[in-house]
Amino acid sequence: GRELPLDRVTDMKRMLDVAITSVRRISTDLRPLILDDLGFAEAVEWHVAEVAKRSHLKIVLNLPAHELVNDDARATALFRIVQESLTNILRHAQAHNVHVSLSSNGESLCLRIQDDGIGMPEKIRVGGIGLVSMRERVNALGGEFRISTAFDSEIHPGVLIEVMLPLKAHNEEVVL
């Protein structure tokens, strides 16, 4: 067989490394490994602690309904929504305090993420890529996604994100 020049082999190895890294990133994006390692509540607690460590944010976390997040689809969607929301708050909100809660009313899970930042313009609320992704995740599970601003005061209106997911899976049928 023909031998390849060393620089060609080096280039091919570099391209293969990039491809492997990309595949790992994509698979992690689909379902974060931390959810498998820690479970939903602990994964959210870990992520919140990491964000708080590297920022000025005071984040209060209250997850009394975490045991109701008992399937991969809901766990992934809710984790990603918390992750994306905290990223947006860090980048844009100029907030100091964030409250993240997960509760249940018996029929639905309700995830609420509230900050005390500067609020959000309408054009971003409608079309930001992260918000579109959150909305799509919720819709895929048969839930509701709401975002509101100006609920706290004129000076610091903040943002409230509410996600309502039915406790019964979107495609589950009730068998009597």
Question: Over which residues does each language-model region extend?
Answer:
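Coiled-coil dimerization/phosphotransfer module
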Residues: 1-176
